[in-house]
Structure formats: structure tokens, C-alpha cells
Amino acid sequence: MQYKLTRVDPNAPNEAYPIGQRELVSDPLLEDQVHKNIYMGKLEEVLNGAINWGRKNSLWPYNFGLSCCYVEMTTAFTAPHDVARFGAEVIRASPRQADFMVIAGTCFIKMAPVIQRLYEQMLEPKWVISMGSCANSGGMYDIYSVVQGVDKFLPVDVYIPGCPPRPEAFLQGLMLLQESIGQERRPLSWVVGDQGIYRAEMPSQKEQRREQRIAVTNLRSPDEV
């Protein structure tokens, strides 16, 4: 059987419907439904979003503490606070199985090399939370034996203020870490060398609530605080 290929002429008259004309109709409602139900972007963006969702909802903490802030951190793992809502109830005894570590307490100079080695044993991706005034800036221990902030030797992702912070503050810091992880862009495969990690710019909670603090007119007495 022989075939003959012919080019379609869009301006040619329609033999089946002589009166009909070809027109491109733009339906805003149809286009809106298409954009809502059909993904028109890059597949990489979908994969990054799905992987970041899994990472931020299955954060396994490394179990160790330095001082009294560790007591408040462990309180957050009890039933009244239910940290399992955030997927962080699986406490690991080995840094090789943990996703993030919480520096809870006073970091002495003798402990700094140990903490740094534990951090290096963690697998990528990994994150660090600095919990309490002593871990953030040395606290009231402005002496030679205390490191004035764990960010002197570790990359800190979230700072939790307080002396010591309440368990609710730890949960808020965990939520901020989840928000930051959701906006990260990491390579989707094993990469040797520089991993090209792009971290999200997290706004300062202090600056965000500055107008709210200034607007307060009725201050509580020291006996009620």
C-alpha cells in the first residue's frame, strides 16, 4: 500500500463544515483549572520539595547534654509536649544515625573538641541547634574556661534564647528548623566535594516582634512575671 504525505493548510476550507471557522478560544476558567491540576514547572522543584518534606518531618536528634538546658530539652520529649508530632521522637545514641544535634548547656573549652568530633561523625545533611544562653554566647560565664558561643567552632542553624529555655521554646526552635529545611536546595545525589547548599534567609524573630513589644502599654508587675 502506498501512502502520500500532504502538509496541512490551516487556512484551507473545511469540507465537512463549510461554514465553520477555526479559532483559538481563550477560556480563563479552563486555564485556571489546568494550572491548579497540572504541574507546569520543572521536575527538580517537585523532587526538592518532596525530599525536603521528608527531611523536615523525620528529624532524629542526637542524645547528649552539657548542663541544665539538657533537662528542659528532655522534658520536651515527654508525653505532655508530644514531640512526636514533628517526627523528632526517635532519639539516637550514635551521631552517625542522627540528623541534628542540640547543644544544650554550657560548652567548656575541654568539651569543644569532643563536640566538634561528634558533629563531624554525623552524616549529611545535618543541622545544629544552640539551646540556652550559655550555648549561644557563654551566658553569665564570661571566663577563660567557657566558649563564648558554640558558633565559634560549629555552624549553628537555630538559636534558642533563655536560661534555661522552656520546652515550648525548644519546640518553637524545632519548627523554625523545619521551616528552614523546607526552603533548602541540596543536591539530589551523592556529590564528592562541595555540596552547594543554599540555606534560606531566616528573619530575626526579635525584629519581627519589635513593633508588638513597643505597642504594649500595660506592663505586668515583677511579682506576676
From Swiss-Prot:
Xref: InterPro entries = NADH_UbQ_OxRdtase-like_20kDa (IPR006137), NADH_UQ_OxRdtase_20Kd_su (IPR006138)
Q: How is the cofactor bound?
A: Binds 1 [4Fe-4S] cluster.
Presence of keyword Lyase: no
Alphabetically, the GO molecular function entries are:
4 iron, 4 sulfur cluster binding; iron ion binding; NADH dehydrogenase (ubiquinone) activity; NADH:ubiquinone reductase (non-electrogenic) activity; quinone binding
- In short, the EC number is 7.1.1.-
Cofactor section: [4Fe-4S] cluster
Spans annotated as Disordered: 202-225
Keywords, comma-separated and alphabetical:
4Fe-4S, Cell inner membrane, Cell membrane, Iron, Iron-sulfur, Membrane, Metal-binding, NAD, Quinone, Translocase, Transport, Ubiquinone
Q: Which domain of life is it from?
A: Bacteria
Q: Which reaction does it catalyse?
A: a quinone + NADH + 5 H(+)(in) = a quinol + NAD(+) + 4 H(+)(out)
Q: What's an example Gene Ontology biological process for this entry? A: electron transport coupled proton transport
Q: How does it sit in the membrane?
A: Peripheral membrane protein
One GO term describing the cellular component? respiratory chain complex I
Q: Does the record carry DNA-binding as a key word? A: no
Basic and acidic residues bias locations: 204-213
Q: Which PANTHER family match?
A: NADH DEHYDROGENASE, NADH DEHYDROGENASE [UBIQUINONE] IRON-SULFUR PROTEIN 7, MITOCHONDRIAL
Which family does the record claim for this protein?
A: Belongs to the complex I 20 kDa subunit family.
List the HAMAP family.
NDH1_NuoB (MF_01356)
Official protein name in the record:
NADH-quinone oxidoreductase subunit B
* Source organism of this protein record: Ectopseudomonas mendocina (strain ymp) (Pseudomonas mendocina)
